[in-house]
Amino acid sequence: MVLIRVLANLLILQLSYAQRSSELVIGGDECNINEHRFLVALYKSGRFRCGGTLINQEWVLTAAHCDRRNMEIKLGMHSKNVPNEDEQRRVPKEKFFCDSNKNHTQWNKDIMLIRLNSPVNNSTHIAPLSLPSNPPIVGSVCRIMGWGTITSPNETYPDVPHCANINLFNYTVCHGAHAGLPATSRTLCAGVLEEGKDTCKGDSGGPLICNGQFQGIVSWGGDPCAQPREPGVYTKVFDHLDWIQNIIAGNTTATCPL
C-alpha cells in the first residue's frame, strides 16, 4: 500500500509539472483591467502604432523606432473601442533620443523619452510605473503586455491588451539566436525557449516588468514571432537611468551610455 501511495504521488507531481510546462507555451491572455495603469498607447493618424510606459505624471518611456510625427498618446485605455471613463489624451511636448540624429540599431539606443504637453492625474486606470531600483536578474519571471498582434506571421490585433509571463535569459542566448547581434549590448534577452510566447508587432515600446520592476522596453525579435529558441530583445532600462533622470531634471544635453 505504501508503494502504491508513493507511486500515485509521483504520478500527480508529474502530471502537475506537465500541465505547468504546457501552460508556459500558450500565448497571453487579456490583461486584468487594473494591472496596466501605466501602459499607454501611441497613435498616428487614428491608428494604433506602439505601446509605452508612463513613468511619472509628465513623461512616457518607449522605443525610438516608435517615433512618428503628430503622435497622439492615450492613457488609461483598455479596450480600443470602448473608452474608460477616465481615459486621457496627450500629445508630445518634447521628444528625446540617445542620439541627436535619432539614430538607433537593433541592439543600441532604441529608447525615446516623451514629455507630455500637460501632466496627467492619477485615476482608476492611470498611474505611473517607477523606474527600477535594482538591475535585472537572469532567471527572473517577467511580465509583458500590449495591444500587439496575437498571431504571427498572419496578424490579428486584439481590442484589449494581452499579458503573458516570460523568462529573463542571459544575453548570450539572444546573441546565439539572432544573427548580427554584437557580443555585448545594453539590451535584455527574454522569452520562452519553447514556441508560443513572445511580444510581437505592435507591442514595441511597451514594458518588460521583472520581479515587479520596469526593466526593459520592447525592441525587436524574430519574424515570425514566438519561434522556438528565439527570445525577444529589450532595451535595458537600468543602463539608461542616468540619462532618463538627467533629461527629466532639465539637462537636455545629457548623453546615453556608450
UniProtKB/Swiss-Prot annotation:
Protein name, entry field: Snake venom serine protease KN13
One Gene Ontology term of the biological-process aspect is: proteolysis
UniProt keyword Protease present: yes
Question: Which tissues does the record link to its expression?
Answer: Expressed by the venom gland.
Q: What is its main location?
A: secreted
Supply the PROSITE patterns for this chain: TRYPSIN_DOM, TRYPSIN_HIS, TRYPSIN_SER
Q: What does this protein do?
A: Snake venom serine protease that may act in the hemostasis system of the prey.
Record's CDD domains?
Answer: Tryp_SPc
Localization recorded for this chain is: Secreted
- Any Gene Ontology CC annotation: extracellular region
Report the SS bond pairs. C31-C163, C50-C66, C98-C256, C142-C210, C174-C189, C200-C225
One of the entry's Gene Ontology molecular-function terms is:
toxin activity
Query: Which positions are catalytic residues?
Result: H65, D110, S204
Q: Which region is the signal sequence?
A: 1-18
What EC number(s) would the UniProt record show?
Answer: 3.4.21.-
**Where is carbohydrate linked to this protein?**
N103, N121, N122, N154, N170, N251
Q: Which UniProt keywords apply?
A: Disulfide bond, Glycoprotein, Hemostasis impairing toxin, Hydrolase, Protease, Secreted, Serine protease, Signal, Toxin, Zymogen
Belongs to which family? Belongs to the peptidase S1 family. Snake venom subfamily.
User: Could you name the domain of life of the organism this protein comes from?
Assistant: Eukaryota
Boundaries of each Peptidase S1 domain copy? 25-249
Task: Summarize the subunit comment.
Answer: Monomer.
Q: Which InterPro entries match?
A: Peptidase_S1_PA, Peptidase_S1_PA_chymotrypsin, Peptidase_S1A, Trypsin_dom, TRYPSIN_HIS, TRYPSIN_SER
